[in-house]
Amino acid sequence: MSPQTETKASVGFKAGVKDYKLTYYTPEYETKDTDILAAFRVTPQPGVPPEEAGAAVAAESSTGTWTTVWTDGLTSLDRYKGRCYHIEPVAGEENQYIAYVAYPLDLFEEGSVTNMFTSIVGXVFGFKALRALRLEDLRIPPAYVKTFQGPPHGIQVERDKLNKXGRPLLGCTIKPKLGLSAKNYGRAVYECLRGGLDFTKDDENVNSQPFMRWRDRFLFCAEALFKAQAETGEIKGHYLNATAGTCEEMIKRAVFARELGVPIVMHDYLTGGFTANTSLAHYCRDNGLLLHIHRAMHAVIDRQKNHGIHFRVLAKALRMSGGDHIHAGTVVGKLEGERDITLGFVDLLRDDFIEKDRSRGIYFTQDWVSLPGVLPVASGGIHVWHMPALTEIFGDDSVLQFGGGTIGHPWGNAPGAVAGRVALEACVQARNEGRDLAREGNAIILEASKWSPELAAAC
């Protein structure tokens, strides 16, 4: 080997394995305004110190690998490495720690949620030194937020388009979700919209199956929507699910929806993927379509308390990728703690500036620098008796979705929709009069049912 090509160990490179914490655990580091900050819930394997576990997460999700490599000398590790800058034990849990990691902004492609997640959670979750790992929160710096388009329209533009103000919006998923022909499906849509709902919805798994192809469904739903609009004088929408097997097919369906003149389409953003979702969000902004987002598959990722990704992170990612509505749970009937946590990420979806508040699960102050907001959708097992609580908890900027609560009405879809609309209007009026919805909710619904036989039948 010639002297020019020989790599000499004496130059400063020393092969071999060394502890991650020697390089990647930096408690003296002061975070920069441009860093992406992550809070990981780390459960180390027995015998692994928390500092080593936290440093391992920082290393494996940035520049590190299991051994020292000579090519480290060709770049500036100090500039590009992730740093675990703080570790704290989780109160009430044995051998669980919150590890805070700072990533330099240069590690990420601009405007790509896909690249952000590939970097931060792509490889590290199978790491042997960890028994479990959960990404609890991310702080997205304004410099990175500004590289994203975000929601196609946002809350204010949606209200302007629909001409609906001063109350939550009402929706309903068409049931049975699978098996109806396109014409019968359209009929169910018409009945619900005619009765007083603002929106009806394709279920997340309604795409283009043999019993109902997407084009037929789009045509009959558009007919139902325009007929209900003509009868009621209100603007109506049906979330036409454009999710498909390829991005090209998805955009083709969105183009057809736009040509029909409908106001909104829908996407399953986790099963469809962030690349597809961002493409659709860009198309929707350019062509005046609202975009409803369903979170099918989220529980696979976020249900375990010590492993996976918390939904607040998936919600932040959706706001960056783009969507005007997203399902956010209901909180009705759940534990108080879960209510606070849910309202924490509801604020992260809607508000422009959210202060750090650990009691609500918000680990970092988040500034969205005027990125449009997303309407949270409450759906799943709710009915008219829940209306006072939902109106109080979610406020006006929300979509309340009563699927079985509408279609399960003993008199049919249209009376079910009437019952929901009357209950909502009664709760909004009572709230505006200063009444306590939490205490007087049942009385408010019963009062309204005296002059609405449809609501009385639903009660």
From Swiss-Prot:
- Site positions per UniProt: Transition state stabilizer: K334
Identify the enzyme class. lyase
The record places propeptide residues at 1-2
InterPro entries listed in its UniProt record: RuBisCO (IPR033966), RuBisCo_large_chain_AS (IPR020878), RuBisCO_lsu_C (IPR000685), RuBisCO_lsu_C_sf (IPR036376), RuBisCO_lsu_fd_N (IPR017443), RuBisCO_lsu_N_sf (IPR036422), RuBisCO_lsuI (IPR020888)
Q: Which cofactor does it need?
A: Mg(2+)
User: Where is the catalytic site?
Assistant: K175 (proton acceptor), H294 (proton acceptor)
A GO BP entry: reductive pentose-phosphate cycle
The task this protein performs is described as: RuBisCO catalyzes two reactions: the carboxylation of D-ribulose 1,5-bisphosphate, the primary event in carbon dioxide fixation, as well as the oxidative fragmentation of the pentose substrate in the photorespiration process. Both reactions occur simultaneously and in competition at the same active site.
Q: What else is known?
A: The basic functional RuBisCO is composed of a large chain homodimer in a 'head-to-tail' conformation. In form I RuBisCO this homodimer is arranged in a barrel-like tetramer with the small subunits forming a tetrameric 'cap' on each end of the 'barrel'.
Name of this chain's protein:
Ribulose bisphosphate carboxylase large chain
What is the protein's species of origin?
Corynocarpus laevigatus
